[in-house]
Amino acid sequence: NVTASAVSHQIASLEQYLGKKLFSRSSKGVVLTAIGEKYLKEVSGALNIIGQATNQVINDIHQDYLRIHSAPSFGLLWLMPRLNKFRQAWPELKISLTCSYESIQFSRDNIDIDIRHGLSQWPTLVVKTIKNERMLPYTSSTYLASHSIQNIEDLLGCDLIHSDSTLINWSNWLSWHKVRGWNKNFIFNFDRSYMSIEAARMGMGIILESNLLAGQSVSQRHLAPVFTTDVSMPVNAHHFVLPHHNEQKEKVRIFFNWVSKELSREGFQI
């Protein structure tokens, strides 16, 4: 807070520096002189710029924050479980993570990296696609033990769970394997992969899901591939997207070096 006397002192100092009267004082208060009005008009733009820059600095919790926006399922199932490992490797670099399917604007939303799910269609941006991602059926060990599944056709008599968000669905996958006679009757339908994965973990049926997103559940033995043979279908569904100038930021380079190593441990590449 600034007192009235302090403001008056600053005005007097400015008027003395300029050698001009900026305010006219009377019993009714203080008003701008003609010179004061002209001066205000000239400097108001600069003052606004200073104000905006000040707010940006104040709102920036820490200049080393790496701001990531992610598709929800990737953020929850792949990135979140590994953030503590990143923190241990780079304790001075902090992360702000937001997850949604909303379209973001890098400058407006102050985002360094956007992890997107979908078809790659951003020609003006840097796009690093995760390679070796594949779609295959998963279920819980309890469901697998209680159902005799010897071949792909046996799936037609099982409880298939549908996920709206996957690029490859049951219809695509079954057609790829030339399976006929499917009536597209799902016992459950979810709009997020993490919901479908959780349903399968609970023994509610069989999902067609990405090995990238289901990987941790498999390693923890909450899920298992339905088939021991390779029946997977390739997909390029997840992408690290960013403006060209963001690629030059040290914190972004650090993150990509780290995430590249993490992905390579699991057989993926960017």
Regions found by a protein language model. Name each.
Residues 2-6, 10:
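Helix-turn-helix DNA-binding motif, specifically the short coil turn and the N-cap/start of the second
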Residues 14-15, 223:
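Conserved amphipathic alpha-helical core elements
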Residues 15-32:
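A short LG(V/I)-centered, amphipathic sequence patch enriched
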Residues 27-30, 37, 48-69:
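Short helix-loop hinge/linker segments at domain boundaries
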Residues 63-123:
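Central regulatory/effector-binding core of bacterial HTH transcription factors
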Residues 92, 211, 215-220, 229-270:
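C-terminal effector-binding regulatory domain of bacterial HTH transcription factors
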Residues 96-189:
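Acidic, Gly/Pro-rich loop/turn segments at junctions of secondary structure
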Residues 182-226, 230-233, 264:
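Hydrophobic hinge/microswitch elements
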